[in-house]
Amino acid sequence: MLIAGGAVLALIGATTAGCLASTGRFPGDSMDIAWQTPPDGNKSEQGNGAWLVGDLLVRSRFDAATAYDARTGEQVWDHRPPGRSRICAAEADVDRSVLLVVRDDENRPASSRRETCTVVTAVDMENGREIWRTPIPTDTAAESGRRFERSLIAAGGGLALVADQGLRAVDVRTGESRWTAAVPGNCVPGKAAPAERHVAVLLACGAPDKPRTDGEVPEGAELHAAAFAPTTGALLWSTPLGDREPVRWDELSSIVSADPLVVSASGAGDKASGAYYSFDKDGVPRPRIDFSGDHGHLNDRLRVAVVDDTRLYALAGYYVKGGTRHRAVAFDLTTGRQVWRTDLDDLPGVALHLQDGKVTVIVKGSATSAVPDEDLYVLDAATGKERDSRSFHDAVAPAGEVFAYEDLLIVARPGASSVPAFTAYARA
């Protein structure tokens, strides 16, 4: 009887293990939903930012900025623009708990299709209340074909940068004017990212003797990275991105990190070319990190990279017989050389998070799988060695941002749709 009972128990155990294996549900190696916010509903407009500030998660989209308790997912406050106005863009100075939202005219006619982002409003991220507001002068020459793409607003280091005819800084908590940047006469400012040490800005700079209208990019302009003093707006340094070959001003570019200053740039429509360019505190260029190399090809469709004081971490694909494989890669910013690389899976990583010496990667599941099969990898930032790997019980919608809060991993969705704005996962 004991033997028969043991056989039954063994059969039950084997059957249970088989079911768990088919779904990836083993005790101690999975991620379960702890809480999620209510879905936004089916709407085509996309969100424009998500942040973790203290114990609050804040998400901005076209119709409102909303905060949720990071412990429970419960709504804490909701800030809505007045009248018919819509939020065009949003940035945050998390250290000062200030959210900056750019909106259009609240009195625009219902028939108007043109979105003019003319007002910046500062919102206290602790309670959702408006602190101050200021107009953004309308750029009457914005339809020109030679305009450098700018940040409507940027925040950080206690400053709010407003893109008007130059580059103007105000105090992020009070809105009081601080300075207007001393941009060289042959340059036009573009995207900006303020930090405590300096204000990082992309410049389109041409020959000083080339004629141009105010705000228009000079003939023959190339892309520069520049740093301005956060207290005065004085130019600290300006360095061209290219070493032997200049980088054109109209290449696809962005500031990956303000300090250390790291910039990505690639030719429009060219998936293979491009690189990350980094600079030391004095503006001396470091060796570039190419998108393509021995590490494979850094994701061109979903450019995912994070930076700490000394390294850049990214996701790459590489080709082998039978298909594409994927890995996480770390590069030394000083030398541009690969420090480590760790193979992930046959499927690409879709989100990357760096915190407390750990690199967290969410790996996309198969579109043809009958069950959710997204995976989570936690790697040691120093060595790339795997610290933890788990499977999600539920499908993970495309992630815009990933946050680690206490023992939760929180995924923010980039747009307004039928999926929740935030979902928190706990290790099970």
PLM ranges: what are they?
Residues 1-10:
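N-terminal export and membrane-targeting signals
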Residues 3, 16-89, 121-124, 129-141, ...:
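Aromatic (tryptophan-biased) beta-strands that constitute blades/sheets of beta-rich domains
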Residues 40-54, 82-96, 102, 135-153, ...:
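Repeated scaffold domains used in trafficking and secretory/extracellular systems
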Residues 62-66, 106-121, 164-168, 208-226, ...:
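Structural motif
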Residues 74, 78-228, 234:
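Long, acidic/polar, low-complexity amphipathic helices and coiled-coil-like
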Residues 180, 184-332:
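Acidic, serine/threonine- and glycine-rich low-complexity intrinsically disordered segments
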Residues 298-381:
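Loop/turn-rich, solvent-exposed surfaces of beta-rich toroidal or solenoidal domains
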Residues 389-428:
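Blade-level signature of beta-propeller repeat domains, shared across WD40, Kelch, NHL, RCC1
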